[in-house]
């Protein structure tokens, strides 16, 4: 009995389940999904229309979740890695202390955030490969984490 307990204690981390991946979409040249990179796993829905194509996409990002903190002074820490290269962390300010450009700036804890954000990266050329982007949403003077998501994009072809 003791060897079994010792074995299961020492090697339990090896046999744990990987974090669940949330599929977003597939396009002709890419697949996109995310998983949580924090332990809070607060339900967040992410949808992209149309699905991302690496040749250049202009579309809308739909984000739906219930705020677990007041959304004030919101910024995103972006950690991006491309193949084996990691880019310097980028900090994007989304909401300032007294408002911002987005309707969810100033939302209170428990309120539903249901927003659509336009995006475009036409003219940018991506090489085939796997891209990772960790998005940490930080809010308030105490810099509390709202959520952390780890996005993965796999670019299949070299059609760009």
UniProtKB/Swiss-Prot annotation:
<keyword id="KW-0391">Immunity</keyword>
<dbReference type="GO" id="GO:0045087">
    <property type="term" value="P:innate immune response"/>
</dbReference>
<dbReference type="InterPro" id="IPR003172">
    <property type="entry name" value="ML_dom"/>
</dbReference>
<feature type="glycosylation site" description="N-linked (GlcNAc...) asparagine">
    <location>
        <position position="114"/>
    </location>
</feature>
<feature type="glycosylation site" description="N-linked (GlcNAc...) asparagine">
    <location>
        <position position="150"/>
    </location>
</feature>
<keyword id="KW-0395">Inflammatory response</keyword>
<dbReference type="GO" id="GO:0001875">
    <property type="term" value="F:lipopolysaccharide immune receptor activity"/>
</dbReference>
<dbReference type="GO" id="GO:0005886">
    <property type="term" value="C:plasma membrane"/>
</dbReference>
<comment type="subunit">
    <text>Heterogeneous homomer formed from homodimers; disulfide-linked. Belongs to the lipopolysaccharide (LPS) receptor, a multi-protein complex containing at least CD14, LY96 and TLR4. Binds to the extracellular domains of TLR2 and TLR4. Ligand binding induces interaction with TLR4 and oligomerization of the complex.</text>
</comment>
<dbReference type="GO" id="GO:0006954">
    <property type="term" value="P:inflammatory response"/>
</dbReference>
<dbReference type="GO" id="GO:0032760">
    <property type="term" value="P:positive regulation of tumor necrosis factor production"/>
</dbReference>
<feature type="glycosylation site" description="N-linked (GlcNAc...) asparagine">
    <location>
        <position position="26"/>
    </location>
</feature>
<feature type="region of interest" description="Interaction with lipopolysaccharide">
    <location>
        <begin position="119"/>
        <end position="123"/>
    </location>
</feature>
<dbReference type="GO" id="GO:0005576">
    <property type="term" value="C:extracellular region"/>
</dbReference>
<dbReference type="GO" id="GO:0031663">
    <property type="term" value="P:lipopolysaccharide-mediated signaling pathway"/>
</dbReference>
<dbReference type="GO" id="GO:0001530">
    <property type="term" value="F:lipopolysaccharide binding"/>
</dbReference>
<feature type="disulfide bond">
    <location>
        <begin position="95"/>
        <end position="105"/>
    </location>
</feature>
<keyword id="KW-0325">Glycoprotein</keyword>
<dbReference type="GO" id="GO:0071222">
    <property type="term" value="P:cellular response to lipopolysaccharide"/>
</dbReference>
<dbReference type="GO" id="GO:0031666">
    <property type="term" value="P:positive regulation of lipopolysaccharide-mediated signaling pathway"/>
</dbReference>
<dbReference type="GO" id="GO:0035662">
    <property type="term" value="F:Toll-like receptor 4 binding"/>
</dbReference>
<dbReference type="GO" id="GO:0046696">
    <property type="term" value="C:lipopolysaccharide receptor complex"/>
</dbReference>
<dbReference type="InterPro" id="IPR039217">
    <property type="entry name" value="LY96"/>
</dbReference>
<dbReference type="Pfam" id="PF02221">
    <property type="entry name" value="E1_DerP2_DerF2"/>
</dbReference>
<comment type="function">
    <text>Binds bacterial lipopolysaccharide (LPS). Cooperates with TLR4 in the innate immune response to bacterial lipopolysaccharide (LPS), and with TLR2 in the response to cell wall components from Gram-positive and Gram-negative bacteria. Enhances TLR4-dependent activation of NF-kappa-B. Cells expressing both LY96 and TLR4, but not TLR4 alone, respond to LPS.</text>
</comment>
<feature type="signal peptide">
    <location>
        <begin position="1"/>
        <end position="16"/>
    </location>
</feature>
<keyword id="KW-0399">Innate immunity</keyword>
<keyword id="KW-0964">Secreted</keyword>
<feature type="disulfide bond">
    <location>
        <begin position="25"/>
        <end position="51"/>
    </location>
</feature>
<keyword id="KW-1015">Disulfide bond</keyword>
<protein>
    <recommendedName>
        <fullName>Lymphocyte antigen 96</fullName>
    </recommendedName>
</protein>
<dbReference type="GO" id="GO:0032497">
    <property type="term" value="P:detection of lipopolysaccharide"/>
</dbReference>
<feature type="disulfide bond">
    <location>
        <begin position="37"/>
        <end position="148"/>
    </location>
</feature>
<dbReference type="InterPro" id="IPR014756">
    <property type="entry name" value="Ig_E-set"/>
</dbReference>
<keyword id="KW-0732">Signal</keyword>
<dbReference type="GO" id="GO:0034142">
    <property type="term" value="P:toll-like receptor 4 signaling pathway"/>
</dbReference>
């Amino acid at each position: 009995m003791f060897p079994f307990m010792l074995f299961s204690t020492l090697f339990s981390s090896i046999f744990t389940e990987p974090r669940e991946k949330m599929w977003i979409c597939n396009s002709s040249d890419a697949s996109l999904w995310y998983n949580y990179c924090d332990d809070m796993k607060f339900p967040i829905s992410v949808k992209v229309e149309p699905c991302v194509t690496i040749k250049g996409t202009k579309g809308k990002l739909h984000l739906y979740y219930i705020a677990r903190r007041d959304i004030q002074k919101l910024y995103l820490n972006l950690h991006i890695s491309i193949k084996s290269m990691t880019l310097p962390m980028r900090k994007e300010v989304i909401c300032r202390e007294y408002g911002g450009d987005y309707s969810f700036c100033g939302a209170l804890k428990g309120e539903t955030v249901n927003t659509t954000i336009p995006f475009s990266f036409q003219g940018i050329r991506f090489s085939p490969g796997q891209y990772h982007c960790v998005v940490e949403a930080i809010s308030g003077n105490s810099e509390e984490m709202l959520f952390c998501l780890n996005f993965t994009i796999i670019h299949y072809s070299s059609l760009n």
